[in-house]
Amino acid sequence: MSSDASTYRLEDVLSSFYRVEKIKKINYHQYISKAQNDQWSIQMEFMLRKQDPKTLVALLSRDLWCFSINDDPVPTPPAIEHKPVSPDKIGTFTADYSKPNLPPHYALFLKALRRKIYINLALGSHNKLIQFGNACISLSGVPNYLVQLEPHLFVNGDLTVSLCAKNMGLVPMKEENLEESFLSKHALYLAPSGIRMHLAPASKQGYLITPPKHTELLLTTLSVSHGINLQNKKNLKWVAVVPDLGHLNGHTPTIASYLTPLLEAKKLVWPLHLIFAQPVADIENSTSGDPSEFHCLQDALDAIDDFIQLKQTAAYRTPGSSGVLSSNIAGTNPLSSDGAYTEQFQHYKNNSISSQPASYHSVQETNKISPKDFSPNFTGIDKLMLSPSDQFAPAFLNTPNNNINENELFNDRKQTTVSNDLENSPLKTELEANGRSLEKVNNSVSKTGSVDTLHNKEGTLEQREQNENLPSDKSDSMVDKELFGEDEDEDLFGDSNKSNSTNESNKSISDEITEDMFEMSDEEENNNNKSINKNNKEMHTDLGKDIPFFPSSEKPNIRTMSGTTKRLNGKRKYLDIPIDEMTLPTSPLYMDPGAPLPVETPRDRRKSVFAPLNFNPIIENNVDNKYKSGGKFSFSPLQKEEALNFDISMADLSSSEEEEDEEENGSSDEDLKSLNVRDDMKPSDNISTNTNIHEPQYINYSSIPSLQDSIIKQENFNSVNDANITSNKEGFNSIWKIPQNDIPQTESPLKTVDSSIQPIESNIKMTLEDNNVTSNPSEFTPNMVNSEISNLPKDKSGIPEFTPADPNLSFESSSSLPFLLRHMPLASIPDIFITPTPVVTISEKEQDILDLIAEQVVTDYNILGNLGIPKIAYRGVKDCQEGLITTTMLQLFSTFDRLNGNDTISKFYNMKQPYVFVKKHHELIKVKHDSQPFIKFLNFRPPNGIKNFKSLLLSSSFKEDCLSFAPTLSQTYINQELGFCELLKLTNEDPPGLMYLKAFDKNKLLLLAAQIVSYCSNNKNSIKNVPPILIILPLDNATLTELVDKANIFQVIKNEVCAKMPNIELYLKVIPMDFIRNVLVTVDQYVNVAISIYNMLPPKSVKFTHIAHTLPEKVNFRTMQQQQMQQQQQQQQQQQNNSTGSSSIIYYDSYIHLAYSRSVDKEWVFAALSDSYGQGSMTKTWYVGNSRGKFDDACNQIWNIALNLASKKFGKICLILTRLNGILPDDELMNWRRLSGRNIHLAVVCVDDNSKISFIDEDKLYPSFKPIYKDTRFGGRMDMTRLYDYEIRDIDQDIHGIVFQHPFPLAHSQHRCAIRSGALIKFKKCDGDTVWDKFAVNLLNCPHSDSTQLLETILEEFRNLAALNVWYGLSDGEDGHIPWHILAVKKMMNTLVHTRVKIANTSAATVHTATSSSIILSDK
C-alpha cells in the first residue's frame, strides 16, 4: 500500500467549517446598569431583538454588550426619557486574541453570534427548527436530529461556523403520549432551554390544564427571545411541569437513576409543543447475545434434519383420514391426533413433546429467557416437580391467540361450516387442564436458596414503540439526506422527497402474518401465483387484516399463563403435526392391525418442501406456533438490531463544566438576578432544605455558576488592554495563570443567587403586552419604560407562583423566565440511559468491586459487545448547498463557503508503525504491531515470562458445553506458552476445572469458598506459593446487569476465602455463555481470551508485550554557533512569555501518560496510566458521588500514582495529562495546578474521538487500497516467485497524523481554545466519500517554546500507544487510532455510569428505593 502522504489531495477533503465573514475588527459597547436596576439589561436586549432579530447582543451579569463586525454600526439601546444611552466602555478586538483562556469579550461575541443564528433559523423555518439547549432541534421529520452550529474565529481572520448533527432519539411530546406507560420510559426536557423536567398530573383525569393567565406574555417572550412563534398556533395544549432545579444549576441528575421522579413540588405551566422526550434504552429486551439465529452448528444441522425428516415422512400420509371430524376414527386411528403413535413415530412424538427450538423466541414473551431456562442439562426444582403431561403444555403457551375457528385451518374455505361443538378435541381439553395445573405449580414453586433476580416485565408492544423511538444507526449519507437536502426536510434544507408510502406498505409485510398464508390450497396458490407476482405490493398491503401478528387478548380461545415464558426442555422437532392431518381427508384409513403401513397413492408431488408458499400444511389452531411466526428461520419484526454504539458526552456542569453554558448563554446567576424569580424558585445552596429535596443527587448542590466568578471576571473588562492582545498571542503556560480570585475556593464553585433580585414581572408584562396590542409591537416608548421602572413592586418575593383561586395552578410568568433565558449544553444531557440498572454495594474504604467490573469491560476483546449499550455519535454534514440553513446564513452574513482541507490542515503525514517485543525460539525479537492476528502461526511468546494459575469454571447451566470449554481454554493457554493452567478439582465427584451449581445462593457459595480454602491449605504444604486462582463465570446474557450479578457472586467467594487465607489471590473472568456454547468459535478467539487472562494475572503491570524502543534515525550535534543562536532565541521567547518561565529545551528523557475523565453527573472518576512503551500500565475507578472532598481525594490518588511511576524514570520527565471529551473544567484544573511541581513538566491535553468537527474524504486514489475497493481489477496479481517482496499490512492499523493550521476551541469548554490542534486519523475501508475516523488532540499548554514540535511528539506517543489496543485486549482492531489508556477510560466510563452504587453501613446511601435486578447478597 502506498504510504506517500504527499500524493494526498487536501483540497478533496471537506471540513465541517463554513466561512461566513472576513474579520478585520470586532466592535463592542458595554452598558452597565444604572441605579442598581437588575432588569434594565434584559429589557434592553428584548427591545433590540424586537427591533432587529439580527442584532448581536449578549448579557453578562447586569451588563449589556452590543457587537458589530468590521465597519457595521454597533446597535444602540433605545433612549430613556428622550435621553440617549451612552456606553460605559467602547473597544475593538481582532482575531489575534490570547489563548488558551479566551478573553471575555470574545466569549460573549460567540454567544451573541450563536443566538443570532438560532433565532433567525427559528423564524425562517416557521418553528421547524427551534433552539434546544445550545443546539437546535429539527421537527420536520423522524428522527428529530439535533443540529449544532458553533462559531469560531480563526487567527487569520476567518469567521467560521462548524456544522454537525446528532440523533439522541428526542421526540416531541404529543397528547396521546400523556400516559404512564410512555412517561415511565422517557426522560422529558423543556425547550428551548433543554432543562430536565417531569410532568405533574393536573388531576386524576390527565395532565392537560387550562392556559395560564400570562399565556400571551409567555408566547410573546418566546417569539422575541428565540424566534418561536406559537401565538397563532391553534389548539395549543398546556401542561404543568416540575423542572429539575438541580439541572438548572448545572447538576446533571444521576444517570443510573435518571428516570427517578423528583421530590420537588415547584411547578410551572409550559406548552406541550415545547416538551421533548428521550427514550430509555431497554438493554434486557433489545439485546441478543449472539446475532446469529443459531447458537451453534448443531442447531443449524438440526433444523436441516427437521426438514429432511418432514419430507421423508410425507410418504406415510394416507388420504381419507381425519382426527377431527370423525370421533370413531379419532378414537381408533393410531395416526390420529388422539391415538397412539406406532413404533416408527414414537421418537418423533417424544421429541416434539419434550423439546422446543432453543433459538426460537415467542412474540408473546415478556421476560428475558436465560440459557438455563431451556438447558437440557438443567435439572432445577421447576422441572423436577412437573409431570410429563405438565411439560407438554408449555410448548403451546406461547402460541398466538387467534380468534378463528380451529377447524377452519383443516378445511377448504368453502367447507368451513363445522359446528363449534366439534372443536372440543381431547388435545384441547388436555391443554386447558395442563395449563391450569402448570399455572398452579409455577405459582407455588420457587427456587429456594437462590438469589432473587427481578425480570423485566414489559410488553412487546411497548417495546416496539420504544425501539421505534430509539436512535437508529444510519449511515452518514442517510443522515445528510434527511438533514440537508432530501427526504422530508423540504422546507428545512431545500430538496424534496417522495412519499414514503412504499415503506409503510412494506412494513406491514413484516408486521403482520395472516391465515391467508396457510389456508391457501394448491389450486388457489397456482392460480394466484401470477397475480401475486404482478401485484405484490397490493397483496402485501392486504395482509394482516384477518389475523394480526399480535393477537387480541380480549377473547382468548384457550387458557394461557401470563408471564410464563420458560422453556422447560430443549429442542422441539418440526414433526409435531399428526401425519394423517397434513392432507385433506378423502377416504378412511385402512385399519388392519397386521397389515404393513399404508403407502401414499402416487400423485403429483409438490415442487419443493422448502418453498414457503408451496408448502402449506394444514395446521390445527394453537398446536404449533412456529409456522404462524414464519418458521424457525424467521425474524420477529419486533427484534430490531441496534447499533452497539455509545459515546456519552462527559461535560462537567456543577462547578466548571457550566462554563460552556455560561459562554453560550450568559445566563449565570448574574443573569438570573435580572429575572423576577421568587425566593423559593431561586437556585440556591440550600436547595435541599428549601425545596424538600432529600435525594442524594442534590447533596452539596450550589447555585448557578457565574462567569464573573470563574473565567470572566468583571475586573477583566476594565483592565483589558487591546494593545496587549497582539503581544500575547500564545500564552503557552497561561492555562496556569488564572488569577486566584478567578477560581472559586468554596466547597462548590457555584455562587448563590443574590437575594436582592428585584421583580421584573410587571415591567416585562406591561412592556410586552402593550406592544402586543399595538399595531407596531416593535416600538417601545421611553415613557413606558420609565414608568414601568418606577413602579416596580417592592416585595422581593414577587408575585405568588400559584393563584389560590385557580384550581389548575395557574403560574406567573416570573417562574418561567429562568427557563427561557437558560440554555443547557448538550454535554449536560446523557446520550444514553438504560434500564434496568444494576446495584453494586461498596463501603467507604473498599471499592475493589468497581475495579473488578471495570477490568472485565476493558479487556474483553469486544466479546461482550459493549454490553448492549448503544453509541451516539456526532455526524458530519456532507452537503449543505441548499435549504433553510444556507438561505438563513446568506441572509445574515456575506458568504457561506465551505473550508477544504488545504484551508485548515498545515501538515498531513503517514505515521510509522511501531514495533513490539516478542519471544520466538527463546530469543527476544521486534515485530510490527499489526502482526497480532498471526500469533498462533508465528509462535510468538510473551517476552516477560510465563504466568501460571489454576482455573475453575462455575456454571448453573449447559454443563456439557462448559465441560468441553474448560479443558480447551486450558490447553490453548498452555500451547501458546503463556504459562501453565491447572484445572482445579475440589471434590472427587466434580470434573476438573468445572463446578456445576443449580443456583448461586449464598450458602452454596460459602461452601464453595470453604472447599477452596481447604484445597489451598492442603496444597500449601507441598508448594511454597499457591498460584492465583481464576474463577470463570459465564454470562447468561451479555448485559451490565448480568455482569454485576456475577461480580457480586465472585465478591462473596473472594471475601470468604481471603478472610481465612489472606495470601490467596482470586481473580475473575466473565465469558458469555454464547461464546462457550458456540462450536464455531475460532482458535484465534480462544487465543485472544487466553492472552486477556495473561494480561489480568499478577503482576498486572506486566502485559503480553510492550512497545520496542527505536533508535533515532539521525543525531543532531550542537556547535558553539548553534548554541549561541539558540540562546538568543530563548531570550526572545523569554521576553515574549516573561510570565510563563518557558524553556526552549524541548527534549525529554521520559514521557508519562495519564488519562482521566469524569462522568456527566460528576459521580464517577476514571483514570488510566502508562509510560511511552505501555509498561507500568494500570486502570482505576472511583465513585465520588456528590462529595467534593472525595473528588479531591481521587485527584490526590491519581497524582500519587503518576508520581510513583515517575520515580522509576530518569532524566527530564514530561507528564502528558489527558482529559477526555474535549473539556477541562476549572475545578479539575485547580487540582492539577495545586498538585503540579518542578520535578515534572506538565503538558495538558484535551482529546475527543467524537468531536463536532468532521472531515469528509473525497479523494479517490490515496491510500492505494481505495481503487481496489472500487474495482478489484485495479489490484495486481500476486507473483508467487516474489513472495519475499510483499508486505502484509493491516489497513485498520494504518494511521496518519494531522497538524491543523489554526487551533480549535474545546468542544465543551468553548471559553478555552487550544494553542495547537492536531489529530490521528484512519481511512475507512472503502473507495472514499466517507468521514474520517478522527481522534482530536488539543494542546492547552506547552512547557517550552515550540508547541508545534511538542504536539507532533504527543501525536507520535499516542500513535504508539494505540498500537497496543489489540495486544491488551481493548478492541479487535476497530479503534486502531485511539491510544489504549484513553480507550480504557472511555470503555469504563460508558459502562459504569449506568450502575447504581449503594454505600454499606452509611445512612446517606446513594441508591434509590427502586427495585433492582441485581443480586444483593446479605446475611440473614
Curated annotation (Swiss-Prot):
GO terms for biological process: negative regulation of transcription by RNA polymerase II; positive regulation of transcription by RNA polymerase II. It comes from the Eukaryota. The modification Phosphothreonine is found at T601. Residues 416-511, 653-691 are annotated as: Disordered. GO terms for cellular component: CKM complex; mediator complex. It is found in: Nucleus. GO terms for molecular function: cyclin binding; transcription coactivator activity. PANTHER family: MEDIATOR OF RNA POLYMERASE II TRANSCRIPTION SUBUNIT 13. Component of the SRB8-11 complex which consists of SRB8, SSN2/SRB9, SSN3/SRB10 and SSN8/SRB11. The SRB8-11 complex associates with the Mediator complex. The SSN3/SRB10 and SSN8/SRB11 kinase-cyclin pair also associate with the RNA polymerase II holoenzyme. Component of the SRB8-11 complex. The SRB8-11 complex is a regulatory module of the Mediator complex which is itself involved in regulation of basal and activated RNA polymerase II-dependent transcription. The SRB8-11 complex may be involved in the transcriptional repression of a subset of genes regulated by Mediator. It may inhibit the association of the Mediator complex with RNA polymerase II to form the holoenzyme complex. The SRB8-11 complex phosphorylates the C-terminal domain (CTD) of the largest subunit of RNA polymerase II RPB1 at serines 2 and 5. Belongs to the Mediator complex subunit 13 family. This is Mediator of RNA polymerase II transcription subunit 13. It comes from Saccharomyces cerevisiae (strain ATCC 204508 / S288c) (Baker's yeast).
